[in-house]
């Protein structure tokens, strides 16, 4: 089954902030790869980010996404570097955006 991608403006903005163009390209390639069998890629997240999945890109970079099986949509919510304990950690950013309601307002469930 082929899925349609919906990428949030927030995610696009986060990708633009990645200074290494090779990593930007790798992120985009991994996102494109989510069109086919996204449920077999990445891992299921827990706690505040339950119902989301994360896929490794290059090094410590991650893409956070959600699958809507009913409408065959992969919602790509955020992308960035994993820096545990840092303010710029992609999971920390995603949690803040989710709490602020910004992720849910940008993409359908």
What are these regions (language model features)?
Residues 24, 41-42, 73:
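Internal amphipathic alpha-helical segments of the cytochrome P450 catalytic fold
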Residues 18, 45, 49, 79:
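Hydrophobic pocket-lining residues within nucleotide cofactor-binding pockets
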Residues 4, 13, 57, 66-109:
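Enriched for short, Lys/Arg-rich terminal
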Residues 10, 50, 81:
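Residues that form or immediately flank small-molecule/cofactor binding pockets and catalytic motifs
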Residues 1-28, 104-109:
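Arg/Lys-rich, positively charged N-terminal/basic patches that mediate binding to nucleic acids
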Residues 32-57:
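A short, surface-exposed loop/turn module that caps and links secondary-structure elements
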Residues 61-63:
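Histidine-centered metal-chelating micro-motifs
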């Amino acid at each position: 089954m082929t899925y349609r991608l919906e990428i949030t403006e927030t995610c696009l903005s986060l990708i633009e902030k990645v200074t290494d163009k090779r990593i930007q390209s790798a992120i985009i390639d991994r996102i494109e790869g989510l069109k086919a069998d996204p449920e077999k890629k990445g891992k299921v997240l827990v706690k505040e980010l339950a119902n989301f999945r994360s896929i490794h890109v290059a090094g410590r970079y991650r893409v956070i996404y959600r699958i809507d099986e009913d409408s065959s949509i992969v919602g790509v919510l955020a992308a960035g570097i994993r820096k545990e304990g840092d303010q710029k950690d992609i999971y920390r950013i995603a949690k803040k955006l989710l709490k602020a309601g910004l992720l849910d307002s940008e993409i359908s469930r």
